[in-house]
Structures are given as C-alpha cells and as structure tokens.
UniProtKB/Swiss-Prot annotation:
Cited function: Catalyzes the GTP-dependent ribosomal translocation step during translation elongation. During this step, the ribosome changes from the pre-translocational (PRE) to the post-translocational (POST) state as the newly formed A-site-bound peptidyl-tRNA and P-site-bound deacylated tRNA move to the P and E sites, respectively. Catalyzes the coordinated movement of the two tRNA molecules, the mRNA and conformational changes in the ribosome.
Top-level taxon in the UniProt lineage: Archaea
Species annotation: Methanococcus maripaludis (strain C6 / ATCC BAA-1332)
PANTHER family in the record: ELONGATION FACTOR-LIKE GTPASE 1, TRANSLATION ELONGATION FACTOR-RELATED
Domain tr-type G: 19-260
The name this protein goes by in its record: Elongation factor 2
Family to which this protein belongs: Belongs to the TRAFAC class translation factor GTPase superfamily. Classic translation factor GTPase family. EF-G/EF-2 subfamily.
CDD domains referenced in this protein's UniProt entry, alphabetically: aeEF2_snRNP_like_IV, EF2, EF2_II, EF2_snRNP_III, Elongation_Factor_C
Gene: fusA
Record flagged with keyword Kinase: no
Keywords on record: Cytoplasm, Elongation factor, GTP-binding, Nucleotide-binding, Protein biosynthesis
Length: 727
C-alpha cells in the first residue's frame, strides 16, 4: 500500500472524528507566498515530493496559473498531520491574492473555520491583506498569522535581531489593529494574534522553515541562530531543525477551531432560519446523523467528469446515489460521485459527514453559494448569499469568429456564470454580441483567453473594455403620475435618495435584495430599522433591488395588494436603466403615495400595471436631479523615494486623488483613489515611470460622482455606444 493510499485510508477514518478535523484556508496579498506555503505543507504531509515543492506549486494545477505564476482559483486538498501523538485531518484551501479574483476568496471563506493569514516580512500589511482579513472576519473565520520571507530581512536588508523583532512587532500590531476593528464583538480580544501563545509564526515558505515562540522554547532555537543559518546559507539545515509544515500545522491545530466549536457561532451568522428547529440544532451541533445541510463553495469544471461542486457540509451526510435538493435553483439532483480533494485529483469515498469539505458530481444546476439539502427535509431559508467586497466594473463584448461556434459559446458563458458569481454574463442571441463583466483587466483576460479560448477551443473577437457606470439621484422629484396604456390605472410616486445609513448597510450586506410578496417580514423590518429607516416606512417596504427600494405609503387601496407583484416588477424594470445613459440606477427610494385602479381585473393585468409603474419610476428618477457615478479603485504604490514624483504624476494624470503618503526607510507608500476609466494601461505606465522598481496594487473602492464638467461628455459616449438617441 503506497503512502498516498495509506493517507486516503487515514482520511476516511478521521472524517468521522470532529475534534480531529480542521478546515483551514491560506490567504494573503498577491505574491506574499500562499501557494509556496501550501505546497510545502503538502510535501511535509507526504502528498507531493519534497524536491518539487515550491517549484511545483501543486495547488496551481491550472496551466494558466502555472504560466502566470499566480493563483487564480482556490484549490482544495485534504491531508493528515500528527501532533502530540494524535492524528488530525486538515482540509486546506489555497485562495488567490490577486484583487481581480476576490470572488474565489469569498467563496473559500464560507467553507473554512480558520485561516492562516500570510504576510510578507518585507512589504508588511498590504491592501489585499486587509481585504482577505475583512472577508474572513465577516464569515467568522478565526485568523492566525504567518510572517513569510524572513530570510530576505536578514540577507537583503541585513537587519539585526533587535530590528527583526521590531519589524515583526510592527506587522503584528497592524494585523491586530485590523482584527480589533473588524472582528465580531465577542471575538475582538480572543482572536488577536498573540506571539507568546503561538498564534504567530515566522519563516520562509520558499526555504521550508518556520518558527514560533512555543517552538523556540521547545527546540532551543533563537533569533540569533536563525540569522546565522540565513547568513551562512544553511537554510536547509534550519528546515531540518524547524520544518515549516510542523510549525504551521501545529499552530493551526492548537489555535484554529474544529467544526464542532466553529459551527456553534458560524451557523447563526450564515443561516437566518429558526435556531430551535431540528435542522437548526443539528447544524449548530455538527450532527452527522441530522438532516442534510451543506453549501456549495465552488464549481470546478473537469474535462472528464463535468461540473464538480466543492461542498462544505454543516449537518447530516451524503452517500453516493443520494437524492439532493438545491434550494436556490429549486432543482432536484443526485450525488453521482462523492469524493475528497487531493490537489488536482479526487479520491472517491463511500460517504461524507458533517464538518467536512467534499467534491460532488451530478449537481448540474448548482452555482457557487448554492444550499444543498435533502428533498425530504428542505432547508428554508437557504444559507445567506455570499457577498463580495468588489463588484464587476469592466465589461467587454465578445463575438465568436465563427458563427458555427455560437451555440457552444453560449453554453460556455452560462457555465462561467455558474462557476464564478462575480462574473456577470449578458447573452444576446439576436446580435450574437455577448457582454462579460468582471473585476478587472486580468479577470476578463483569464475568462476570454483561458476559459473560452483554451478550454473551450473557440476563437472570439474581444471588444475594447467598457467601464460599468451607475446612476443615482441627488434631489427629490415632484409627485409623478404613472399611467397604464389603457389610461384606466394611475399610480402616484415620488423618487428621493435612499437614506445614507440604509444604503451603507446594503453595501455591507446587512440588508439585501428581497421582494416582500405580502408584507415586510419581521426580520427584514428589524434589519431596516437597525440600518436607520423610519419604522413606519420599514414595515411598508415592498422590494429592495440592486440597491434601490420601493415603499408603499398608500392607505386603504383594496386592489393594491392584488397588483403588488406587478408593481414590484414594474419598479425593477424602472431602475434597470437610468435616464442619463441607460445605466443601472442605485441608491433610490421610490415612495408610492397614491393609486387608482380599474374595478375590472381584466383591465389591470400585467400589460397595464407593469408599464405604468415603469414609466412612473423612470420619470420620477429623471426629475430628481440624476447624476452619473463611476467606479473607483484604491491604488497603492510602494516605490523608492527617487521615483515618488513620477508615481504621483502618474496618479494625477489619471484624475486620481492622493489620499495619503508615508515614508518607510528609503521607500515611499502612496495611497490614492483613481477612476477605473483612467486605469487602462496603468501597469505598463507605472513600471515605465519607476523603471520597474515599484510594487503596486489596486482594489475596488465603490462608486463616486462623475465630475459635473465631464458628465455630459461621458453620458453622450455611453448613449452613442448603446445606439440611443442623444438627449
């Protein structure tokens, strides 16, 4: 029996022992060393050969990732680690650090209970470190810290033991400041990364060594020894004395929770159902014999097996051949194969129980974030939808070069939308021109070149990237009448800006899109009031959609309840295209103040009510001082001081605003905010301006008003592009 086969047998046994399972992720800023760390953990556990680790990047098993040298999709693997004479099952997920792939990070966080946050000793805490930490804490995932690339502080920056400790303390303090700011109230103190108890490790993933304070005490290695090993180029010996996988996995087992502990506080956070119900209690207890409840965290497309769903189970168990029910898509499915992940391979097992991460085939309609349960005990409601900190901000139009490829292209686009819910796909079968919206240039490039070109074998023409704008209002409209085509139904409404605190709660995911078919639910009302909406309005909200809401302030109109669903549909159609450039509207509250309907139901059907509301909403928005909003990115540039002026000039030339500047040694850090529309070609330009000596990163920072002097020009460009008549 080979080493891997033994490992599989051990995994099967340990899957049933909850206190010996750790579901953990590795997350960090791009290039801080996540995948190298993952590989060396796998090598230490005997999953891949030690010689290949680091170069092999076992988790970067997609050709595109290997070519770019960055992790694009989150990969999963299960392995066994022995600690204090006991064996533990570690389910490990490696997540991408590149800002364009933030969606994968969000989805991975739903599957795990703890995370090793990797931070580069040279660069320190970077914007993406903060973003992944925010995602983790929002999902109640407990963090521990690994400070990587310590050898560079010694060999390149020549730091003394005192300076080394100073640098570590600064990074730890910054991470703890973020944890204090963003952690759930009850964990603000408990979850701080404390060096003494061993919640922080230091080392070099590339050279395969790490230490922590408890490990130093056990092994007698000091900071001075580490400096000697690095300076004398004996990091191999150091790796024998302080192996990376032992230190990191010991830290994970000691400080990260097992599924039993974690589900007690994670379930109420991600599931809003009745905690006293059978299934509620079963999930909190992580009961393998309870009703089935799980969430799909990722869809992986395998050339042979088709769509594979990575799934975290919170309750019950899945066996091969079980009938399943997908709550979001309201579809039945069957578990054709049940397996565990071993990097790029999957190993079939007879069944998987609560607290584990597994691979399922047969869920054809599943999307990332889908709730899985049994058809005999449907989980109502499903799990909270996955909210991302970024939004798609760039769109490209693509067309198949060959018309015969059209049906296949449409199929692939639908598949991409299922796999990655940060991609928006609009399929236009009439014109053959399809729109893909993504998080940034790289995200779009990977979709068009890799997913469509390489995997799908379809040649496509890709249009120029288009920036996604939004529209909102700055004033209140007069009372507007929306009339049905037959003139027998009239609805009166006012458009006004949504309360700032309520819109902020929407952006943070505290309130979300929802139609209240009969009346506002108690839970929905409570959340709206908490967000700052007046109680009287909160209990009259009919629908929240794309960051807009409609509130029914009428009284005693009998037919209104019958027409409620049609009014909601008309409202949605009304805010899909704004008056300035037919871009989506956000941040608008429509107050319905009066209505008259024809007595005869035949004369107040969908063909009458929907257009009446749609025209009314559009007219009200047009008369409430509409403005264009453009997507912004926070841009961080880390550059030698000699090039600081060039870096700032590059930002200023792109309508950017410098928000903050810091000096650190001979490096300058420039923090700025730049419109996405001005960011095309930035990578090449900033490298040229600083002769390739700078590090830079961007992340989406929301929408802001387009400067008044530019608005007419931009609106005209968008209208011309869409073939709309100029206003």
């Amino acid at each position: 029996m080979g080493r891997r086969a033994k490992m599989v047998e051990k995994v099967k046994t340990l899957m049933e022992k909850h206190d010996q399972i750790r579901n953990m992720g590795i997350c960090a800023h791009i290039d801080h060393g996540k995948t190298t760390l993952s590989d060396n953990l796998l090598a230490g556990a005997g999953m891949i050969s030690k010689e290949l680790a680091g170069d092999q990047l076992a988790l970067d098993f997609d050709e595109e990732e290997a070519a770019r040298g960055i992790t694009i999709y989150a990969a999963n693997v299960s392995m066994v680690h022995e600690y204090n004479g006991k064996e533990y099952l570690i389910n490990l997920i490696d997540t991408p650090g590149h800002v364009d792939f933030g969606g994968d990070v969000t989805r991975a966080m739903r599957a795990i209970d703890g995370a090793v946050v990797v931070c580069c000793a040279v660069e320190g805490v970077m914007p993406q470190t903060e973003t992944v930490l925010r995602q983790a804490l929002k999902e109640k995932v407990k963090p521990v810290l690994f400070i990587n690339k310590v050898d560079r502080l010694i060999n390149e920056l020549k730091l003394t033991p005192e300076e080394l400790q100073g640098r570590f303390m600064k990074i730890i303090a910054e991470v703890n400041k973020l944890i204090e700011k963003m952690a759930p109230e009850e964990f603000k103190k408990d979850w701080l990364c404390d060096v003494v108890t061993g919640k922080v490790a230091f080392g070099s993933a590339y050279n395969n060594w790490a230490i922590s304070v408890p490990y130093m005490q056990r092994s007698g290695i000091s900071f001075k020894d580490i400096i000697d090993y690095c300076e004398q180029e004996k990091q191999g010996e150091l790796a024998d004395r302080a192996p990376l996988h032992e230190v990191i996995l010991d830290m994970a087992i000691t400080h990260l929770p097992n599924p039993l502990q974690a589900q007690k506080y994670r379930i109420p956070n991600i599931w809003k159902g009745d905690s006293e119900s059978t299934i509620g209690k079963s999930m909190v207890a992580c009961d393998p014999n309870g009703p089935l409840a799980g969430v799909v965290t990722k869809i992986i497309v395998d050339k042979h097996a088709g769509a594979i769903s990575a799934c975290r189970l919170f309750s019950g168990r899945i066996k091969q051949g079980d009938d399943l029910y997908l709550v979001g898509s309201k579809q039945k499915a069957r578990a054709q194969q049940v397996s565990i992940f071993m990097g790029a391979e999957r190993v079939q097992v007879p069944s998987i129980s609560a607290g584990n991460i597994c691979a399922l085939t047969g869920l054809r309609e599943a999307t990332a974030g889908e709730t899985v349960c049994s058809p005999s005990e449907i989980l109502e409601p499903g799990f909270e939808s996955l909210t991302h900190t970024s939004e798609p901000v760039i769109t490209v139009a693509i067309e198949a070069k060959n018309t015969k490829d059209l049906p296949k292209l449409i199929e692939i686009l639908r598949q991409i939308a299922r796999e990655d819910n940060t991609v928006r796909v609009e399929i236009n079968e009439e014109t053959g021109e399809h729109l893909i919206s993504g998080m940034g240039e790289l995200h779009i490039e990977v979709i068009t070149n890799t997913k469509i070109g390489r995997d799908g074998g379809i040649e496509v023409d890709v249009g120029e990237p288009i920036v996604v704008y939004r529209e909102t209002i700055t004033g209140t409209s007069p009372e507007i009448e929306g009339k049905s085509p037959n003139k027998h139904n009239k609805l009166y409404m006012i458009a006004e800006p949504m309360d700032e605190s309520v819109y902020a709660a929407y952006v943070e995911g505290k309130i979300h899109d929802e139609d209240y078919k009969k009346k506002t639910t108690a839970d929905g009302e409570a959340r709206l009031v908490e967000a700052g909406l007046e109680k009287e309005q909160a209990k009259r909200v009919m629908s929240i959609y794309n960051g807009n809401m409609i509130v029914n302030m009428t009284r005693g109109i009998v037919q209104l309840d019958e027409a409620r669903e049609l009014i909601i549909e008309g409202f949605k159609e009304g805010v899909r295209n704004g008056p300035l450039a037919a871009e989506k509207v956000q941040g608008v509250k429509i107050r319905l103040v009066d209505a008259t309907f024809h007595e005869d139901a035949i004369h107040r059907g969908p063909a009458q009510i929907i257009p009446a509301v749609r025209f009314g909403v559009r007219d009200a928005v047009a008369q409430a001082k509409p403005v264009l909003l453009e997507p912004m990115q926070s841009v961080y540039i880390n550059t030698p001081q000699d090039y600081m002026g060039d870096g700032m000039k590059e930002i200023n030339n792109r309508r950017g605003q410098i928000l903050d500047m810091e000096q650190e040694g001979d490096m300058s850090i420039i923090k700025s905010s730049v419109p996405v529309a001005e960011m095309f070609g930035f990578a090449g330009a900033i490298r040229g301006a600083t002769q390739g000596r700078c590090l830079w990163s961007v992340e989406f920072s929301g929408f802001e008003r387009v400067p008044a002097e530019l608005q007419p020009k931009i609106a005209k460009q968008i209208r011309d592009r869409k073939g709309l008549k100029s206003e």
